[in-house]
Swiss-Prot record:
This is Tyrosine recombinase XerC. It comes from the Bacteria. CDD domains: INT_XerDC_C. Residues 110-293 form the Tyr recombinase domain. Forms a cyclic heterotetrameric complex composed of two molecules of XerC and two molecules of XerD. Residues 6-89 form the Core-binding (CB) domain. Gene3D superfamilies: 1.10.150.130, Intergrase catalytic core. Keywords: Cell cycle, Cell division, Chromosome partition, Cytoplasm, DNA integration, DNA recombination, DNA-binding. The gene is xerC. Coiled coil: none annotated. Site-specific tyrosine recombinase, which acts by catalyzing the cutting and rejoining of the recombining DNA molecules. The XerC-XerD complex is essential to convert dimers of the bacterial chromosome into monomers to permit their segregation at cell division. It also contributes to the segregational stability of plasmids.
Length: 307
């Protein structure tokens, strides 16, 4: 085995291509793998991948710990390396996986703070009078993030045919390319309809099917949404650190507090917990829609309300 042949940037690039094309991971996730591998390579030095040992992996984890990295960050790095070494073994470029049994120090689980219902209402209701195209787009984005508990990557991957305005439903592609069907409340539907009326003003290419586009007619980037959300939060006197995942967490918190139905909430969130996924698959859409209608502060998705 030629150690140098896979100890190059090309090997890492090939692995990243594999993640994007074969495993169909989002660009954001692939970039995370890339950052982890670059940092690991820096800390491990020039030693070929196939000569690294369990001791090297423990030393890497210890080095990250000394740098003050959290247990979660170290575990993510080790997870990246385990995945990378599995790929190398599959390609015949490594004999074993030295990261397989290495565990990072446990860190306490800290959930992001949720906005309360009044704060969410202030955030969303304050922008309903602005008819500028970008403002209408941002309003639809914020409404959907909270109405459906979307991950940022899920929001950005939405296409025009992802939402059924008549049936008040959204088809979302989540982690692992898994799809789920979500009910959508009246305020979010109204916001999306208003956005779709002005969306043609920003279109530069007739084949652009992204639901949310930039002022240049391209599919929105994660940083654009994050920056716009922070801007709207500041304008409305809310936490400057407001980010898309905080709206997702607020969605989950408010539904769980109102319904107490943990299984339905986790199904709506698209969580893929190996220990509990089988339970969630038995919940049908009608049950999820009923939980949503009865518990979500901005639901009201009955057909007669939509007229």
């Amino acid at each position: 085995m030629d150690s140098d042949s896979h100890n190059t940037l090309q090997t890492v690039n090939t692995f990243l291509t594999h993640l994007a094309s074969e495993r169909r991971l989002s660009p954001h996730t692939v970039n995370g793998y890339q950052r982890d591998l670059i940092e690991a390579r820096t800390l491990l030095g020039s030693q070929p991948w196939d000569t690294l040992t369990v001791h090297d992996m423990r030393s890497l984890a210890a080095s990250l710990h000394r740098q003050g990295k959290s247990g979660k960050t170290i575990q993510r790095m080790l997870s990246t390396l385990r995945t990378f070494f599995r790929y190398l073994m599959r390609e015949g470029l490594a004999r074993d996986n030295p990261a397989i049994d290495i565990r990072a120090p446990k860190s306490g689980k800290r959930l992001p703070k949720a906005l309360d219902v009044d704060q969410v209402s202030h955030l969303l209701d304050a922008g309903t009078s602005n008819s500028e195209p970008l403002a209408l787009r941002d309003q639809a984005i914020m409404e959907l993030l909270y109405a459906c508990g979307l991950r940022l990557a899920e929001l950005l991957s939405l296409n025009l045919d992802s939402i059924d305005l008549h049936e008040s439903q959204l088809l979302v592609t989540g982690k692992g390319n898994k799809t789920r069907q979500l009910p959508v409340g009246k305020p979010a539907l109204t916001a999306v309809r208003r956005w779709l009326q002005v969306r043609p003003m920003l279109i530069k290419s007739s084949d652009q099917n992204a639901l949310f586009i930039s002022k240049n007619g391209r599919r929105l980037s994660p940083s654009s949404v994050q920056q716009r959300l922070k801007r709207h939060a500041l304008e409305r006197g809310l936490d400057a650190h407001l980010h898309p995942h905080k709206l997702r967490h607020s969605f989950a918190t408010h539904l769980l507090e109102s319904s107490g139905d943990l299984r339905a909430v986790q199904e709506l969130l698209g969580h893929a917990d190996l220990a509990t996924t089988q339970v969630y698959t038995h919940l049908d859409f009608q049950h999820l829609a009923q939980v949503y209608d009865g518990a979500h502060p901005r639901a009201q998705r009955r057909k007669d309300d939509d007229e």
